[in-house]
Amino acid sequence: MNKRKPVVALVGPTSVGKTATAIELALTFGGEVVSADSRYLYRGMDIGTDKPTLEERRGVPHHLIDILDPRDDYSLALFQRDAQRAIEEIHARGRLPIVAGGTPLYLRALLEGWRIPPAPPNPELRAQLELRARREGPEALHRELQTVDPVAAARIPPENVRRVIRALEIFLTTGRRMTELEGREAPPWRVLWLGLTMPRDELYRRIDERVDRQVARGLVEEVQRLLEQGVPPDAPAMTALGYRQIVAFLTGQLSLEEAIQRIKYDTHRYARHQLTWLRRMKQVEWYDVTQPGWYEQLRERVERSLREESDEGDVAVHQSGGGKEAPRA
């Protein structure tokens, strides 16, 4: 009988410190990181995504980072395929996959065995919906989605225009809701869900400080460079938080100060949405990163889970001696 192999899923809102924690766990337990952050996929989008540098990765292999041109489209089904392949390859090397990210839809589709609705893209309809989003605003499309598929609307925030459009596209093409077409099958892995959190005021402070750092590091120049390289301002990658607001500044729709404040406000809202989604997942074990000893408790939880697997003859626990101190967020 084949037992399911282990996967650690590290979740939480933006700015809570998932990336640094995933790297520390990987160093401790012989792991590799699989990114479940939709923004990390794109090359040349480093500052606005707060993507870890090679130095910050500390030699830990990372997967699904810098695999796309910003002009490329990407779907949930493609992410699921690519991430599954990465996990299988990591297991084949006898190492521990650590899936880390804040895109709830990606995490759940991958680790809960979702079957993606079999509705082919409709480019003409999609173009019409994209035009409406630009003219009427993403909230208008989200209200329409609430009318035809309230379950999908509850789990897709208005800011995720691509997913809102895809859900509407599925309904308008097939006459059925996305949530009716979705299915699930048991994932082939044993997933340990670990969540990082902190008081909301502290989280907002971290978000605001990060945005200020990004602007100081050259966020405006990064967006300008992408536009000069021919990336359309309405490309899927450019709808990411931080990028669309700076595009609005560069095209004269907002002042720089207004754009910065909009980034902070929209990121606060996105963090709330992430937490709302993740709090519904009863399998997640939460750790408050502002509490003393939180990382040691989390490390011990992973060690205990892997030891239970090892006792059953599935995997070995590889510890390098890392994880003695809490990682920096």
From Swiss-Prot:
Substrate binds at T14, S15, V16, G17, K18, T19. It is an enzyme of class 2 (transferase). Residues 320-329 have a biased composition (Gly residues). The keyword Lipid metabolism does not apply. The keyword Transferase applies. Residues 37-40 are annotated as: Interaction with substrate tRNA. Residues 306-329 are annotated as: Disordered. Its cofactor is Mg(2+). ATP binds at G12, P13, T14, S15, V16, G17, K18, T19. GO terms for molecular function: ATP binding; tRNA dimethylallyltransferase activity. Gene3D superfamilies: 1.10.20.140, P-loop containing nucleotide triphosphate hydrolases (3.40.50.300). The record marks T103, R126 as: Interaction with substrate tRNA. Keywords: ATP-binding, Magnesium, Nucleotide-binding, Plasmid, Transferase, tRNA processing. GO terms for biological process: tRNA modification. It catalyses: adenosine(37) in tRNA + dimethylallyl diphosphate = N(6)-dimethylallyladenosine(37) in tRNA + diphosphate. Its EC number is 2.5.1.75. Pfam families: IPPT. Monomer. NCBIfam families: miaA (TIGR00174). Belongs to the IPP transferase family. PANTHER family: TRNA DIMETHYLALLYLTRANSFERASE. Catalyzes the transfer of a dimethylallyl group onto the adenine at position 37 in tRNAs that read codons beginning with uridine, leading to the formation of N6-(dimethylallyl)adenosine (i(6)A). This is tRNA dimethylallyltransferase. The gene is miaA.
